[in-house]
Amino acid sequence: MKVSLIRTPLLVLCTVLCSVPLPAATLGQELTPVGAQRAGNADGSIPRWSADQLSDEAHLQWMQRITREEPLYIITADNLQRYRQWLAPGLLKMFELHPESFSIPVYPTHRTARQPQWTHDYIRRNLEDARISESGDELLAAWPGIPFPKPQTAQEVIWNHQTRWKGVFISLHLFESTVYPNLLVDSLETIIETYAQLYDRSRQSPQLDSRNIYYFSHILGPARLAGGGLLIHDSLQPIRQPRQSWIYITGERRMRRSPATGYDSPLFNSEGLRVADEIDIFNGPLDRYDWELVGKREMLIPYNNQKMRYNRCDDPQALLPYHISPHAMRFEKHRVWVVEARLKQDKRHIYKRRTFYVDEDTWSIVLVDIYDKNDDLWRFTMRFSAYYEEMPGMFSSLDAYHDLQDGAYFLQCSAGEGTEFFTEPPPDGYFTPASIRKRMKR
């Protein structure tokens, strides 16, 4: 059965739940330590957040039980009308385009997200000390934690996404696969290391240095590309201090400055299905868009996808034409912030409009509807998160970027092993071009 996509204004979509926490709401009481609503919803389908009351062992057992659950129900093209109020336009479009193969398994909701207590202590301090620029495009000051647990603007929500807890220093072992409608798969194996200086607890002031985020990507395979690398020094004040980047060229065995990668710059490893500011779903400057904080809404979103931690995203059993197998997915009902970004008239970007859905418990963007210059839904992004005890916290196990017009999709996923989370900063100089060159020569 074909299902047509109904274009629904965002303000109508927010009728399910559209509220911003009042300033009087207290962190750790009505709100969780990161600013989510602690209470469940009226019908009990979203439970109260209580992950802070569990020991590490009890939380681990909880996660193990989750992996053994069966779906409460499965949404198909045949019963879609019953559930469409909980779905993003991108998901509705997937049903319209692929009614025979696409479905959504919906499981019980578990609010498993939590993070170290010391980050909670700093988040409370950020209520007084965190600051953004007048334009909202730069983060000027914050202690190690979410800057804005009670956001009043869309920019504050997006800065929360960009600075959310992901550990201090991370080494990720990933597979990246472009999947075409004929199931031709083009894959890369990479190691990505990132360091967020924001979470350095030795800082004596909330004021932020211009260089604050460090990123290095190293290609392991295939053989024709192995050895190449990309180093980025990024900024939380990107208008004053734009990012710097270098590439490592295997044949030359040296680092070379490269044009800054940002906004809608193409990324070679995704065949144009993902642009530079879509790394981590969204990253970098906010200045090319006008931002609107629409409110909060209950939605069905990918969540607690523990099994994806151990599945390669080039596994043929998980791949179908146009999308991954629904059997690999887990959706739950959660509350999200809804943020709309519209391209400014005097700015350039291939995406005219984007709607971001941000999980209230983690501040991670989990879904994105992306529109072209004609305001047609063009692309759709999903983040499948899992809980990582080593972090500890929620982190992406798979990001899926769909081109709804040509049918191809790009996946970035955990390799299942080799990913490490560190609670302390890397050695001094670890992310300098000289250090990278020395390590790559070994």
Cite the ranges covered by each PLM segment.
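Bacterial N-terminal signal peptides that target proteins for export
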Residues: K2-L10
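Residue-level detector of alpha-helical hydrophobic segments embedded in or interacting with membranes
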Residues: S4, V16-C18, G28
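Sec/Tat signal peptide C-region and signal peptidase I cleavage site
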Residues: V20-A24
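Solvent-exposed N-terminal domain segments of exported/luminal and surface proteins
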Residues: L27-R243, I249
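Extended beta-strand-rich segments in extracellular/periplasmic secretory proteins, especially
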Residues: S171-G221, I279-F356, V366-V368
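Long, C-terminal catalytic modules of enzymes
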Residues: E417-R442
